[in-house]
Regions:
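Hydrophobic h-region of N-terminal signal peptides that target proteins for export
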Residues: 2-10
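Conserved oxyanion/phosphate-binding beta-strand-loop segments in alpha/beta enzyme cores
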Residues: 69-133, 255
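Secondary-structure capping and domain/repeat boundary segments
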Residues: 469-516, 523, 527
């Protein structure tokens, strides 16, 4: 009965049309248009159906028209068959607007449906695609912003494009067409395990997530709980993503055990007394820079799912590493930031002054942060590397002006051609709570302003913790007789930043003010 109810909940014959106004019409837009034709069939959660896709993209700065008959000479970026299904966990169950996963295929599924790799909207050639459906993220840019900021630093980050989607002639609003972490040459570029001379030391990807798959690997170690003690009731779950469990039968015997061993080797090291050893410690098993880059992206966004859900790790085999100049240690990539950047009202997700890696000390959940992130942060050498990397970030992509410029550019993209207005007319997101909003804005501008304020506060916190701070210059000052000064502050030069100034709620009348003192009665004395 439970399975039946779940299946019914996961699909509807009307394919979840817009809830505010299902009659919104798209005539023209600055965004690419994705037409999906399911011919009236019901889209399913667990099984794929055959559909057709056509993508119109006349190029940057050009208008795309929804009336194909009236505008027959438009550029068709791609047209063909796809195998389509719903995707996502919380993004599906808690959202009126449903995300899709699809694969490009040469023929309908009923005729074999062989996969075909294509490039969509300039993204890397592959056959596995996602249409994210931003709903709780009312800015619709949190994933895009995080990926674009992190792209120069990590080895691979998904590329993505905002689009407008039409399903069976009905307008469904703004979506994000994105690559997903995968084995393809233009993704993580993984071979089949054993493909390189039978080497079973890598070329796989695992995902730290829930135990909601039929097959997964449960770590022999437990995460830390509150008070820094190990919580033996909680587990670290590794899902098999590339290859999937179903693929093991067609791969060399022992592939699953080899994946488990590579996880064990890393975790055994972290659990050992000498894990900080620069040669034989954890640096032997993980690409430290990759883990730092993942950590900084996760902490900058204060992603409440970070480290413990949708956390992707991959590695190449030692043979490939030797032959192709790769690194065979575990690496990280990015995925799923729609409820990050102050967009969660649980686990203190709106706070800007906490660390996500330390979540286990504050919260209780079935999926906690793996123990080895705390082991990393407990290593002074790792902290030194982390701080140095953050300094590079702040001088590069994460500079205040660059972050603001990226946000403004994305906001303009979504508003200049009316896409945001149409999406709001269809779905009615603003002015109401959508799980798990920590902030409810009444307009797109409200949401963008909140995002900017939150980021500014988060950067201030991280800079204070990770960057060298200017030391206060304390020198003796003579205080007039009769005053017992608790604090003496020298007047700041005119060039000092206002953020560093000391302010009081009463005006000081003097010109110039060289020094002032505050006595035990809170009286201000200027001299």
């Amino acid at each position: 009965m439970l399975l039946c109810l779940t299946a019914l909940y996961a699909q509807r014959a009307d394919n979840y049309p817009p809830t505010k106004n299902a009659q919104v019409k798209l005539s023209e837009t600055n965004l690419p248009i994705v037409f999906i034709d399911v011919d009236g069939k019901m889209i399913l959660r667990e099984e794929r159906i055959t559909a057709k896709i056509k993508i119109i993209d006349n190029g940057t700065g050009k208008t795309n028209y929804a009336d194909l008959a009236a505008h027959p000479d438009q550029k068709v970026d791609y047209e063909g068959y796809i195998s389509l299904k719903y995707r996502g966990n919380s993004s599906f169950n808690s959202s009126d607007k449903k995300p899709y996963g699809f694969k490009t295929i040469a023929k309908p599924l009923e005729e074999g449906g062989k996969k075909v790799k294509v490039s969509l909207l300039g993204l890397g050639k592959d056959n596995d695609w996602v249409l994210l459906a931003p709903f709780s993220d009312k800015t619709m840019i949190r994933d895009v912003l995080t990926f674009e900021l992190g792209r120069p630093y990590l080895d691979w980050v998904p590329s993505l494009r905002h689009v407008e989607v039409v399903v069976d002639g009905k307008y469904y609003g703004i979506y994000i067409l994105t690559e997903r972490p995968g084995k393809g040459k233009n993704r993580l570029n993984l071979h089949d395990p054993g493909e390189d001379g039978g080497d079973l030391t890598g070329d796989w990807r695992v995902e730290i997530d829930r135990d909601d798959e039929d097959h997964y690997y449960r770590s022999k170690y437990h995460p830390y709980g509150r008070y820094g003690t190990v919580d033996n009731t909680k587990y670290i779950i590794y899902q098999y993503d590339d290859p999937e469990y179903e693929d093991f039968a067609d791969l060399p015997a022992g592939t699953e055990k080899a994946i488990q061993k590579s996880i064990d080797d890393m975790e055994d090291c972290f659990a050992g007394d000498n894990y900080k050893d620069p040669v034989n410690g954890y640096r032997k098993y993980i690409d430290v820079t990759s883990f730092i880059d993942y950590m900084l992206s996760t902490e900058f966004t204060f992603n409440v799912d970070g480290y413990r859900l949708s956390s992707h790790m991959y590695k190449y085999s030692e043979t490939r590493a030797k032959n192709e100049g790769l690194d065979s240690r575990w690496k990280c990539t990015l995925w799923d930031f729609n409820i990050a950047l102050g967009n969660a009202d649980y686990y203190k997700g709106s706070r800007t002054d906490l660390w996500q890696y330390d979540m286990n000390s504050r919260e209780t959940d079935n999926q906690l942060v793996p123990f080895w992130w705390k082991r990393l942060i407990d290593d002074p050498a790792y902290q030194t590397d982390l701080k140095a990397r953050w300094a590079q970030y702040r001088e590069g992509q994460y500079a205040d002006n660059r972050i603001d410029a990226k946000i403004d550019s994305l906001a303009t993209l979504l508003t200049s051609g009316g896409a945001m207005e149409r999406n709001e007319a269809a779905w009615g997101m603003f002015g109401r709570y959508v799980w798990p909003n920590a902030y409810v804005g009444y307009s797109f501008n409200d949401e963008i302003s909140y995002l900017k304020r939150w980021i500014k506060s988060r950067l201030t916190f991280m800079d204070k913790k990770l960057l060298p701070q200017e030391k206060t210059d304390i020198r003796p000052v003579t205080v007039a007789s009769g005053y017992n000064a608790d604090v003496v502050v020298e007047a700041l030069p005119a060039s000092s930043h206002a953020d560093n100034a000391v302010t009081f709620n009463r005006r000081i009348a003097c010109n110039p003010c060289n020094h002032f003192a505050i006595n035990t009665d809170n009286a201000i004395f200027v001299f």
